[in-house]
Amino acid sequence: VAAGSNSGPAPLDAFASCLTEKGATYYGAFWCPNCQKQNAMFGKSKKLVNYVECSTPDSKGQLQVCIDAGITNYPTWDFPPIAPATTTTRVIGVQELETLSQMTGCVLSGSGAATTTP
């Protein structure tokens, strides 16, 4: 199937952008099968997610940014505190889009459009 030039945004663009606006960070590695599953959930909209590649290009080490963040498993998602909480929430493993919605307040609609709940 050849990739064509699509007009308009991908179905999950607004949701992915909302995750980034809310401060969600996704840490992964290019060689990680579960990261590939997570990426597939977003499709073309993955480019709008705040993704941090943790693997060195030779896949034998971890980049300093991920060492400093304490990342030990992939995929890992960090979410900033939502009042009254004061600490970052970290979840490890493939997350369903609905879970990401709950963690951020970004609404996942049937059309893929997202809005923020008050």
Regions flagged by a language model, labelled:
Residues 63-80:
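Structural micro-motif
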Residues 4-50:
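Local sequence-structure signature of Cys/Sec-based thiol-disulfide redox active-site neighborhoods
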Residues 30-35, 55-59, 72-73, 83-85, ...:
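Solvent-exposed loop/turn segments at secondary-structure junctions
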Residues 38-41, 60, 72, 112:
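Secreted/processed peptides and extracellular or luminal domains of membrane proteins
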Residues 18, 28, 56-65:
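Structural microenvironment flanking redox-active thiols in thiol-disulfide oxidoreductases
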Residues 78-118:
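Non-catalytic, surface beta->alpha helical segment in thiol-disulfide oxidoreductase systems
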